[in-house]
Amino acid sequence: MIVTEKAPAKINLALDTPMRYLDGLPRWNMVMNAVDLADYVTVEIHHRPQTIKVYTNSGFLPNDQRNLAYQAAHILKTRFHQTDGVTIRIKKKIPVAAGLGGGSSDAAAVLRALNKAWRLGLSLDELARLSLSIDSDVPFCVYSQTAHVTGHGEIVEPLPAFPHYWVVIAKPKLSVSTPVILRQINYERLVHPQTDQLVEAIKEGKFQESFQYMGNALEAVTMEAHPEIARLKERMQKLGADVAQMSGTGPSVFALCHAESRAKRIYNSLRGFCPEVYQVVLL
């Protein structure tokens, strides 16, 4: 049986971490949204061989157990005692190591696909609970809708969807290691976005007002090591973005625009400035 799933990228409308847990991992307080930039994940189950194989069109991704999609298949195969082999083919569109959750979304897509292929009958809530051991972004990616995400990433509260907004995403030509950034956090120096106010504004349908509450507490940490991210954000702001900020731990920066003409202006201006630029919409 073959199942194909769309795996959308995510952006962080708000990203905050007020403290670390005793296990050393951050406590998250985030608002996340899927965007229409997506990988496509095709999963095939077969009796022979009984192994898990991953193939991608990207030379930057491992094809073994380090790949989050592989880990997702392994979890379901082991938990539900499935003897079938699994072949996973990932058509990458989302930039790798970009702060856009591409690997996490691929893993979530594998969970949804195998749930269908093996007829496990699991709800999205059950898949999300199983997924936390893979990565903190995977539970959100199981749902891929506007959500308030807290805890280790396992508490996902759906929020009303934004109306039609345009998003320009730009990834500078550099890589950022999330574990390195997280180790560099000085909690006494973090500037915290108004995440709770953002959540309330979204719940009340005050989407334009919500822009003032968006922010990313880790911007300063990443920008200290990579000042070109700050320059990219400033360029988006000067070009008229309603909001411009870094997604995740970077290096991607996104501009949120209510008008398509403004988004096109930013997109066209950045194409000669940045190697990877995308104009998409919020999902």
Curated annotation (Swiss-Prot):
Q: Which PANTHER family match?
A: 4-DIPHOSPHOCYTIDYL-2-C-METHYL-D-ERYTHRITOL KINASE, CHLOROPLASTIC (PTHR43527:SF2)
UniProt protein name: 4-diphosphocytidyl-2-C-methyl-D-erythritol kinase
Catalytic residues, chain numbering: K10, D137
Q: Which residues bind ATP?
A: P95, V96, A97, A98, G99, L100, G101, G102, G103, S104, S105
* SUPFAM superfamilies, per the entry: GHMP Kinase, C-terminal domain, Ribosomal protein S5 domain 2-like
Record function comment: Catalyzes the phosphorylation of the position 2 hydroxy group of 4-diphosphocytidyl-2C-methyl-D-erythritol.
Provide the alphabetized UniProt keywords. Answer: ATP-binding, Isoprene biosynthesis, Kinase, Nucleotide-binding, Transferase
Q: Does the keyword Kinase apply?
A: yes
Single GO term (MF): ATP binding
Disulfide-bonded cysteines: none
* Pathway where it operates: Isoprenoid biosynthesis; isopentenyl diphosphate biosynthesis via DXP pathway; isopentenyl diphosphate from 1-deoxy-D-xylulose 5-phosphate: step 3/6
User: Which reactions is this enzyme annotated as catalysing?
Assistant: 4-CDP-2-C-methyl-D-erythritol + ATP = 4-CDP-2-C-methyl-D-erythritol 2-phosphate + ADP + H(+)
- BP GO annotations: isopentenyl diphosphate biosynthetic process, methylerythritol 4-phosphate pathway; terpenoid biosynthetic process
> InterPro entries of this UniProt entry?
GHMP_kinase_C_dom (IPR013750), GHMP_kinase_C_sf (IPR036554), GHMP_kinase_N_dom (IPR006204), IspE (IPR004424), Ribosomal_Su5_D2-typ_SF (IPR020568), Ribsml_uS5_D2-typ_fold_subgr (IPR014721)
Protein family according to the UniProt entry: Belongs to the GHMP kinase family. IspE subfamily.
Q: Does the keyword ATP-binding apply?
A: yes
Q: Which Pfam families match?
A: GHMP_kinases_C, GHMP_kinases_N
The EC designation for this entry is: 2.7.1.148
